[in-house]
C-alpha cells in the first residue's frame, strides 16, 4: 500500500557558513530558537543542531510530522516572529542554505535497544 505524500514526515535542513569564532554562539541561539518552535508549533518530531569540526558550518535539522506543520513554523521565520534574520546577522553568516525533504525511510533505536525501520513508499 502506498502512503500518501501528505502523510509523510517532513525534514527541514538549514546550513550556515560562518567564521569559527561565531560557531558556539550560533549553536546556542539555534538551540534556544528550536526550543521556542517546539513550544509554539504542533508537529515537531525531533530537532538537532550540529557543528562541523572545522568550526565553519552549523546545521539545524527539524523533522515535522507533516509538511504543513514545518511550513507553518517556517512562515514564522519569514514573518519575523522568530527573528531568524536577526540571528543570521548577529552571527555574521556568510551563507545560509535552506533545504526540505520528505522522509521515505527511517531507522531508529528504541529504549529497549531494538532497531525499528519505517519504510514509506
Where would I find each of the regions flagged by the language model?
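Short, surface-exposed ligand-recognition loops at beta-strand->loop->(often short) alpha-helix junctions
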Residues: 17-30
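Short, well-ordered beta-strand segments in beta-rich or mixed alpha/beta enzyme
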Residues: 9-17, 46-78, 113-121
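An amphipathic, aromatic/His-enriched active-site/gating alpha helix that lines ligand/cofactor pockets
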Residues: 5, 32, 36-45, 63-99
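Residue-level signal for secondary-structure boundary sites
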Residues: 22-24, 68-70, 106
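Glycine-rich beta-strand-turn "strand-cap" elements at beta-sheet edges
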Residues: 1-8, 48-56, 84-121
Amino acid at each position: 500500500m502506498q502512503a500518501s505524500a501528505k502523510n509523510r514526515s517532513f525534514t527541514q535542513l538549514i546550513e550556515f557558513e560562518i567564521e569559527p569564532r561565531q560557531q558556539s554562539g550560533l549553536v546556542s541561539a539555534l538551540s534556544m530558537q528550536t526550543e521556542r518552535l517546539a513550544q509554539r508549533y504542533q508537529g515537531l518530531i525531533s530537532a538537532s543542531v550540529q557543528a562541523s569540526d572545522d568550526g565553519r558550518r552549523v546545521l539545524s535539522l527539524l523533522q515535522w510530522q507533516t509538511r504543513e506543520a514545518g511550513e507553518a513554523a517556517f512562515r514564522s521565520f519569514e514573518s519575523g516572529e522568530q527573528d531568524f534574520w536577526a540571528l543570521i546577522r548577529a552571527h555574521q553568516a556568510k551563507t545560509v542554505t535552506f533545504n526540505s525533504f520528505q522522509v521515505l525511510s527511517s531507522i531508529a533505536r528504541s529504549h529497549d535497544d531494538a532497531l525499528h525501520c519505517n519504510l514509506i513508499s
